[in-house]
Amino acid sequence: MGKLTILVLVAAVLLSTQAMVQDQPADRNAVRRNDNPGGASRKSINVLHRNECPWQPWCG
């Protein structure tokens, strides 16, 4: 009887997690919007290139 109880509990947990994943409104086909084109890392790399960066591995 104990094994049946554990099996039922595991099934309930799996079903509830599957339902939570399906409830998320994210659309897989949606195009992501880039609010920060280039980003901070690209800006810092550009600054390093302009200043002739002495640290070759980090200059890109």
From Swiss-Prot:
Residues 1-19 form the signal peptide. One of its GO terms (cellular component) is extracellular region. The modification Cysteine amide is found at C59. Residues 20-50 form a propeptide. Residues 25-35 have a biased composition (Basic and acidic residues). Belongs to the O2 superfamily. Contryphan family. Its target is unknown, but this toxin may modulate voltage-activated calcium channels (Cav) or calcium-dependent potassium channels (KCa). This is Contryphan-Lo2. It comes from Conus buxeus loroisii.
